[in-house]
Amino acid sequence: MVQLSSGPANLAKTLRLMAGHDLVTEGFQEGQVGSSAMPHKMNMRSCERIGGMTVVLKGYLSMVTDLTGDQWNEGDVSCSVVRRVALPDSFFVIDGLMQTFITVLDDFGLYPQVIERELNHYLPFLSTTKILSAALNKGMGREEAHEIIKEHAVASALALRNTDVGDNMLLHDLGKDDRFPLTEKELLQAISEIGTGLVQHQINAVTADVEALKERYHEAENYIPQPIL
């Protein structure tokens, strides 16, 4: 059950981090209170609950493993008292965790405009490896290219943090640097394809597994979770 909870717990933590940057939401119901002290807050309450229930499950796992190698000639009450608490309660906890997780997935939402702004803000930094490769393809030495890119990247990052410059100027500044072999237009072309690696392949693999499970368990496809208190 701890292993089963690890996926929802990890995603819940990721969503909490993303929500901190206003990228996503788990849904905020009418009448829900995010914080009794700060009325504006819309805390990821359900994701926080998933994290807490995962900790509870790990606690029960710790209780049960403490019985390992600690019995005398036979089991006794010191063993059964732990089992009687940990075993049934673990099922209650994993049930509540999964009910909550399904609700989070059902009510999940994202904010594309905020995501686009963040992508535009950080994409030049995330693409410095591509920029470095493009410079090498132009015949520039690796160490020299690395140093120039680092120089402008640090300057751009500090400008974004300390001034009202607004836009990430890394590509503009690199393109204007006579020491660097690419123009701003060439740099934009070099990073135009956002690198997502094997993400699409992984999505397709997971989707195929889900479809197989749906074929096997038809009733699960339309399951409606119990209301969250």
For each predicted feature, which ranges?
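Acidic, glycine-rich loop-and-beta core segments that form the ion-binding/anion-interacting portion
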Residues: 1-61
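Glycine-rich cofactor/substrate-binding loops
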Residues: 23, 40-229
